[in-house]
Regions:
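Flexible, solvent-exposed loop/hinge segments and secondary-structure transition points
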Residues: 2-211
């Protein structure tokens, strides 16, 4: 009987120590992941808004913004785009330079219509509506196809452009708001374009377009 109790206590102690060890490892790993995600986000902020010194979160009526965004989609975009549209605004921040002067807005947006399921990116937009650029926080597309969305040849098409909305084309882009789709990856091209347009419409809403 004593041996059974002893063995039970030993087993309990081992289980307890193992559980505490796993919990500690999880917490350390979780903290490490959180730090890496924050680092990636800050790097993205600086990429899409050169000269960034500080930033503040922007509070806005997300319900009213969503209504406004959908109105703009219905007004500006094709029936095919409207039916597939599945983008959401995750975060909006106001960007300032090191002297405290306003630079514009940085929007984090997720689009759930990518070939790999979803993509998340940041978009830098100046106060006058000029898109400064995009940077991906997560992108799980097909290597050699949709992953080319990270290539400069594709991403640079969105830089320093002031347009009401973007659209992709499978032929040569001619208008200012047209971008060349990634060859054999129009689903990814569509997801990126829709996510970016969502960000443009959101900034327009915040700066007075929705009033």
């Amino acid at each position: 009987m004593k041996n059974i109790i002893k063995d039970t206590l030993i087993l309990f102690a081992i289980t307890l120590v193992a559980g505490l060890g796993l919990g500690l490892v999880y917490n350390v790993t979780a903290n490490s992941r959180a730090m890496q995600e924050e680092k990636t986000k800050i790097e993205a902020y600086n990429t899409v808004m050169p000269g960034l010194g500080s930033f503040d979160n922007v509070s806005f009526d997300s319900v009213a913004a969503d209504i406004y965004i959908k109105e703009q989609i219905n007004k500006n975009e094709t029936e095919k785009t409207i039916k597939s549209y599945n983008a959401t605004i995750d975060e909006v921040i106001k960007a300032k330079d090191k002297s405290g002067n306003d630079l514009g807005y940085i929007i984090t947006v997720t689009d759930n219509e990518a070939y790999g399921g979803s993509l998340q990116m940041t978009v830098g937009i100046k106060d006058d509506g000029t898109v400064m650029g995009i940077s991906f926080l997560s992108l799980s597309e097909t290597p050699g196809l949709g992953m080319k969305a990270k290539d400069d040849d594709f991403m640079s098409q969105f830089s320093n452009k002031k347009v009401d909305f973007f659209k992709y084309t499978k032929s040569e882009a001619k208008a200012d708001n047209e971008i060349n789709a990634i060859s054999s990856a129009t689903i990814t091209s569509n997801a990126v374009t829709n996510g970016l347009n969502c960000a443009i419409y959101c900034v327009d809403f915040i700066t007075g377009g929705g009033k």
